[in-house]
Amino acid sequence: MRKTKFIIVSILILGFCMIQFGASPLSAFKKLNQVISLSQELYFEEFDINDAMEGAIKGFLEELDPHSQYISKKELESINEQFEGEFEGIGIEYSVLDGYITVISPIPETPSERAGLQPGDKIIKINGESAYKISNDEIFKKLRGRKGSEVKIHILRVGEVEPFEITLIRDKIPIKSVIASFIFDESKIGYVKINRFANNTVQELAQSLFDLESQGMQKLIIDLRNNGGGLLSQAVNMVDMFLSSNDTIVYTKGKIRSANEVYYSSKSIYDKTYEMVIMINNGSASASEIVSGALQDLDRATIVGERSFGKGLVQRQIPLMDGSAARITIAQYFTPSGRLIQRPYDEGIGNYYDESSIEDTITTNKSIHYTKSGKTVYGGGGIWPDFNISYDENFNQFLKNKVRLNTKRPIFKFANDIKIINESKLNKLTEEKYYQEISKGNFLNLNQTKFIEWLDSNNIKYNYEEIKRDWRYIKYDIYAEIGNSMWGKNISYKVRGLYDKQLIKSINILKD
């Protein structure tokens, strides 16, 4: 009976496809139907036909281009959450360290912050049940929940003899797009780090700019590095904030009429006129490339860093009958000067995501275009920065350091121990004073010997030569973790900026 039903459904699908597409794909559909029937008849064990068909749909869409995709119902819920900019829960950033949920930082203005959770706190029980070595899925199920509902957690805190219980009332938790914003006081240069383009991104940016302007900001750096994109509307509205004339921001070209659109600037209520730098790298994609490409083409910002990823395909998300969705590419993005953002993908998906091939395809396919004032810019995929600043080999080696990549997060743990030892000294400092102390030299007497002794005492494997080679970067990461624990993400990003060549270059451009 099961097989008969399936054959009837297959015939109906086949008939529909023939009506829609004509008879030319008939042999392909026959072949698919034959493979399905043979698999059901001959496969050595039972299998879920729905799972198999989902795999077939995924494969079909992946064959079209790297960004058309099938999204399951469960995946779609998570993706929608990211774009909507909120979820319901207790509000912590965490890692599972030594088997326990360890608080990296409480999210500001959430139940966890209001209850006084601290970086380094270990959640050992949830609602009376052990939380030791539970899966991420279980963590989500137990800590997230309806706004107003209650969850009890037992906390083990460094310095406390006994664990203690906290009752939290779940609430709406914002997923921030702007994750850091601060000002370099002496130069009056503002810095804003944006990590996604969601429903509330422009609103968050506007609030950050208002706060920075009230502190005397005169110039601005927007950091879009490793920002993989998001909503087109937010990218367009962000560019519009910094334009005072009617200009094309981005346009799209596709096969169907509705896919051909031009997005223009309007008379913005913001109309920000200060000098700007946009920072990008090869993790900057889609909406990030629309923003950086438009502001570069319209001579509104200087672009610093590395060329961007080159994702310039427009997807339309279409809901399917079971709550899943298909994202189908309907058009390509072009910057105001006519540059196609999408880089070639005819060598296959594996090659498309290979970092070395990204450089090769973009370098090979360079084309010349001109900004509004006549300055030369390059197309062929991705956005080319005005100042190409690559990290040196020393920093690239640090990124691969075994201690830095260790899932036990030794740098975070060591920083937490140093913070506890020096708590009375740190409590007397402001955020700005802390930054000044670090800039002067070896604050808190951090040294390699102490760190290595700590690694040994905690049975953490390391390579001595790597520690010696990378100590400058490790030291600033320790300072950044201490700062994050005391004052939040702003000081963390500011401290890491002390070894960030791309940020240093951006500051120097705006100072000149």
What are these regions (language model features)?
Residues 17-28, 32, 36-44, 48-49, ...:
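Cleft-lining beta-strand/loop regions that shape enzyme active-site pockets
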Residues 282-285, 293, 300-304, 309-379, ...:
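Acidic, polar loop-rich interaction surfaces within structured domains
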Residues 43-104, 150-180, 496-507, 512:
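Extended, small/polar residue-biased N-terminal targeting/export presequences
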Residues 105, 134, 167, 329, ...:
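Short linear motifs in exposed loops
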Residues 90-91, 268, 327-329:
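A structural signal for short loop-to-beta-strand junctions that line the ligand-binding cleft
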Residues 340-341, 345-512:
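Conserved functional hotspot residues or short segments at active or partner-binding sites
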Residues 5-20:
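Hydrophobic membrane-insertion alpha-helices, especially the h-region
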